[in-house]
Amino acid sequence: MALRRLTLSLALAGVLAGCNGPDGGVLDVAIIDTPENLFADGIRLSSGAQHVRAATSHGLVALDSRGDVIPALADRWIVTDDGRSFIFRLRDGDWPDGRALTAESMRAELLQAIRALDGTSLGLDLAPIEDVRAMAGRVVEIRLSSPVPMLLQVLAQPELAVVREGEGGGTGPMLMRREGDGAVFTMKPPTERGIPEEEGWERFVRPVVVRALDARGAVGQFEDGAINVVLGGNLGNLSLANVGPLSRGTVRIDAAIGLFGLHVRQGSGFLAERAEREALAMAIDRAALVAPFNIGGWEATTRVVQPGMHEDRGAVGERWAGETIADRRQQAASRVAAWRRANDIDDEPVRLTILLGEEPGHALLLRELAGQFARIGIVLERVAEGAEPDLLLVDRVARYASHSWFLNQFNCTLRRGLCSQDADALVGLALSATDMNVREAYLAEAEAQLTLANVYIPFGPPIRWSLVRGNVSGFAANPWAFHPLPSLATLPR
C-alpha cells in the first residue's frame, strides 16, 4: 500500500509543487470498493464505479453534489405540457475522437445504451421511452408512451453516459490516469467541458487522487491524515467509522432513499405460502434492529415503497397499525407452530438461511435479527457467498424517487427471487396510463399486491455514510449517496 501511494504521489509531483492540504493541492479520496469493481467497464457498475464513470463520461444530463440534475452533453431542454416529450439541445463541440457531436450520433448512442440495459432494473425504468428522434442540427427528442416526471433523473445515471474516448479523454469533465489500485483525476479546460473559456481557471480546481480500499483501510488512512474523504460506507462497516474520536473529520450520513430489508429467494418449505412469509415480517421490531448503530433520523417502515414519494397519496399505509410488537409476535409464533404441526416436525425448529455481508455491522444485524426470529420459533443461519439462501439482505440506494423504481426491483423478469406477476401487470398498466391520477392509482395497487405477496420484508431506508474532513468543499449529503468527483475537484471562489 505504501508503494502504491508513493507512485501516485510521484505522478502528481509536478502538479502539486508548492501546494498542500485539500484547499490548495491534491484531494485524496478513498472509495470503499475493490480495484476490479471501481474501474469496471460495462453496465453493471458498483457504487464506486458509478462515481468513476460519471467523472470520465457524460450523458445528456448529470448529477451535481446535491443530487440535482444539471446539464452535460445537453446544455438545455424543455418538456412538453403533456409530459410525454423531452427535447434536448446538445452543447457546442465535438466528440472526444474529433467526430461531430450531432443529434443523429447522440440518438445512436442513446439507443445503444438503452439496448445494453435490457434485462436490468434500469432497463425497466427506461421502458416508457417510445422513440428517440434526431431533429434539426443538435436537437434530440425523447418521446414517451406516458409521462415520466423523473426521466431526467434516470437519464443522469452513469450507465447512460456515452463512453467515447479520444486524445482528450472521454465525454466527461475529468481526465483519468490509472496508477496502481487508484487513479488521478484532473479537470479538463472549460471549453472541453462545454462551458465558456475562463482565464486562470486552473486556480479553482484541484487534482483528485482516488484509491480503492476496504473499509478498515480507508478509515485507518483517514484517521492517519493520509485521506481527506472516504466514500461508499454502508451499515456493514459503519461501526468502523465510530471507533475512536473522529477529531480530524466528520461522519456524514446520507438521508438515502432505497431498499433495506429481506428478499425471499426460496418459495418452498416454510416460505412456500404468503401467510408464513408474513409471519416473518410481523415478528420484526425494525427500530430495534438498527438501534445498536445509533443513527439519528432513521425511520423504520413496513412498506415496500419508501413513504414520501411524489406519487404517494396515502392509499397504502404502514402494516399492523395499532398492534404491539408483542401481539404481532404472538400471531407469528402461532403460525410457525401451526406449520410445524401440519408438517409433522413438532420436535424440530424451523430453520432458515440468510445471505448478507461479512462486515462487523452485518454480524450485529444478524445477531439481532436471529434473536427476534428465535422468539417465534425460527432458527436463522448465515450461508456463505455462492450458496442459495432462503433470504437475501437487500441494501440498495434508489436511482430516483418514484414508486416505479421500488416496484421494478422485484419485477419477475429480473429473476432475483420471489415476485408477484399481479404487481408487474399493474406496473405495466401504470406505464401505459396517460392520466397521472390513473397512473398513481395503478402504482398504489401494485404496491399493495406486492405487499400482500410478502416476497420482500422491508426494514427502512438504506444507510450510507462518508468521512469528510472539515476543510473539504464540494461534498453534500443527498438522497442518492452519490458524491461526484468533479464537485470535489472544484474549489470555492
Tell where the protein language model's regions lie, with residue ranges.
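Periplasmic-binding protein-like
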Residues: 267, 271-312, 324, 450-455
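N-terminal lobe/hinge region of extracytoplasmic solute-binding protein
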Residues: 31-81, 111
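Aromatic- and charge-enriched surface segment that lines or borders ligand/interaction sites
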Residues: 76-119, 221, 270-272
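Structural transition elements
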Residues: 299-341, 359-363
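Gly/Pro-rich hinge or "lid" segments in bacterial periplasmic/extracellular proteins
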Residues: 146-208, 214-217
